[in-house]
Curated annotation (Swiss-Prot):
Domain notes per entry: Avian ovomucoid consists of three homologous, tandem Kazal family inhibitory domains.
One CC-aspect GO term: extracellular region
Presence of keyword Repeat: yes
Entry protein name: Ovomucoid
Glycan-modified residues: 43
Length: 54
């Protein structure tokens, strides 16, 4: 199972680095920072489906 450590988030600004992750909502997030901010916003209901585009 793919996991991402989101303990250091949310962050106010994410880098433009492109390393896509696919969330459990079938949305592709451009990087770990954007994904983790979305996890925080979802109160932990959003999870990582897999690394790469959805």
């Amino acid at each position: 199972v793919a996991t991402v450590d989101c303990s250091e988030y949310p962050k106010p600004v994410c880098s433009l680095e492109y390393m896509p992750l696919c969330g459990s909502d079938s949305q592709t997030y451009s990087n770990e920072c954007n994904f983790c901010n979305a996890v925080v916003d979802s109160n932990g209901t959003l999870t990582l489906s897999h690394f790469g585009k959805c």
